[in-house]
């Protein structure tokens, strides 16, 4: 509200919108609804981008910078999937507040094309 009231059009905020909370899917836990519509109702410019696509991310920042002069702050909502790229983590909230077992970590790193970094 402060940013809108003071017309902070040079302010760019970001949210990782993965649809999950630590204890379950967002709609089952808090029923937040359309996050984009909420930010717009609060007076912000809203840009929705694919948080897994570098081109989409860069385009979102370009659009946000172009919003200067609009007298509105900008919120970029990055739509993501928790655990994206790792079959046993993708789409579940179970790893929101926990760590994988050592053998799971090794598997996850392989799936992401990374090399093991040693003991954790």
What residue spans do the PLM features occupy?
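Glycine-rich ThDP/TPP pyrophosphate-binding loop and its adjacent helix/strand module
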Residues: 1-120
């Amino acid at each position: 509200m402060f940013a809108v009231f003071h017309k902070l059009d040079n302010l760019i905020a970001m949210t990782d919108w993965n649809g999950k909370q630590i204890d379950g899917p967002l709609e089952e836990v808090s029923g937040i609804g359309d996050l984009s519509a909420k930010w717009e109702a609060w007076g912000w410019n809203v840009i929705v981008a694919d948080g897994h696509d570098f081109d989409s991310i860069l385009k979102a920042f370009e659009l946000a910078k172009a919003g200067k002069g609009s007298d509105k702050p900008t919120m970029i909502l990055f739509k993501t999937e928790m655990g994206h790229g790792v079959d046993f983590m993708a789409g579940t909230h179970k790893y929101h507040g926990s760590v994988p077992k050592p053998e799971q970590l090794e598997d996850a790193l392989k799936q992401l094309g990374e090399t093991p970094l040693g003991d954790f």
